[in-house]
């Protein structure tokens, strides 16, 4: 569906959790193989940082409690000037077929403008990695920092992500 929209000239920007900010490493392990197709269609990709800046901290921290790490759990699509889909529904096979989650479609320019501003702020270099492909090599850039492998919270998370990739579980994610 995204490829069709791109072929019609629609700009598509995706904000997804980075390896470091995802709460289900198994999901990330199977998402990674779709990056080349996203790049091939000209889709812009951003991965939310597990160590975000002021915007992320403001949204996550509830004084006096400060989050040790922050993950992205937002499920929203902003389409055009006034349509927003938001809810608990993951956009995957399992959620659509098995889970009993919900979503709303809201048609309001004011709401869409607010959501767009929020998501744009979450895509800033302080909050997210801009993921690009240069000569077939994926790069994560955020401000002056550029990395050649997915930013993770720990070596254990990297090993877990590798092991999950070996399991035939994609249809269950």
Name the predicted role of every residue range.
Residues 1-173:
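PLD/PLD-like phosphodiesterase catalytic module centered on the HKD motif
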């Amino acid at each position: 569906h995204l490829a069709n929209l791109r072929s019609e000239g629609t700009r598509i920007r995706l904000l997804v959790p980075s390896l470091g900010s995802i709460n289900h490493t198994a999901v990330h392990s199977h998402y990674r193989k779709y990056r080349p197709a996203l790049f091939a269609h000209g889709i812009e990709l951003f991965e939310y940082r597990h160590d975000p800046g002021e915007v992320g901290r403001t949204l996550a921290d509830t004084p006096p409690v400060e989050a040790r790490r922050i993950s992205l759990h937002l499920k929203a699509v902003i389409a055009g000037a006034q349509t927003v889909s938001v809810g608990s529904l993951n956009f995957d096979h399992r959620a659509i077929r098995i889970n009993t989650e919900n979503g709303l479609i809201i048609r309001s320019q004011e709401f869409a403008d607010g959501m767009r501003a929020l998501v744009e702020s979450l895509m800033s270099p302080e909050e997210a990695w801009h993921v690009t492909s240069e000569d077939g090599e994926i790069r994560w850039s955020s401000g002056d920092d550029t990395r050649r492998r997915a930013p993770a919270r720990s070596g254990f998370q990297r090993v877990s992500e590798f092991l999950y990739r070996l399991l035939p579980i994609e249809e269950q994610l």
